[in-house]
Amino acid sequence: MKIGIVGAMAQEVEILKNLMADRTETRVASAVIFEGKINGKDVVLLQSGIGKVAAAIGTTALLQLAKPDLVINTGSAGGVAKGLKVGDIVISDETRYHDADVTAFGYEKGQLPANPAAFLSDKKLADLAQEIAEKQGQSVKRGLICSGDSFINSEDKITQIKADFPNVTGVEMEATAIAQVCYAFNVPFVVVRAISDGGDGKASISFEEFLPLAAKQSSALVLEMIDRL
């Protein structure tokens, strides 16, 4: 089995990259694909760049060139569900775009033509992630993760997203694009991210301060997932 892992930023993939043995590096457009072994397992690690387009370009290259059997999206997210705090884990049951709107033609908010309204995560992967997170003593929230090309940093933005998607747990900028590509290629995926901020007016300061913690927490979970897969 070959395990695919996707993170947007260098800080989000650095821990796993540094654990890779026999590491090779391939650049495709703005994406960097690292391939090697982690604890004896075949792993391909994508540093995609930030945003939906970068994530889609990188994930497409990853699936076509490296052909992983599954994809885990790791990194950080803004926590918008009640009770979430910095360092907590969010795991996707589904992902949706919060900034797509073709409702004028009868589609659901967030749905793009020729695509489902929500991209469903692989249940076995989500179950495994939750089991490991709870075993590690992490606080976990599982459910809907919403993506858009905006860093959410105000209560007004959170209120709008929650009005459209009341069950949203976390917000970020790549997961749904990654999920859409995996859906198109029929590759199972799950999103496993750690909370770096609350999406409010202090989000940018919190993100800068707590990104290393979020990267450490999510990487620890993904590392054990690799061992168990």
From Swiss-Prot:
Substrate binds at residues 78, 152, 173-174. Pfam families: PNP_UDP_1 (PF01048). One of its GO terms (cellular component) is cytosol. One of its GO terms (biological process) is L-methionine salvage from S-adenosylmethionine. Disulfide bonds: none annotated. Its EC number is 3.2.2.9. PANTHER family: 5'-METHYLTHIOADENOSINE/S-ADENOSYLHOMOCYSTEINE NUCLEOSIDASE, 5'-METHYLTHIOADENOSINE_S-ADENOSYLHOMOCYSTEINE NUCLEOSIDASE. This is 5'-methylthioadenosine/S-adenosylhomocysteine nucleosidase.
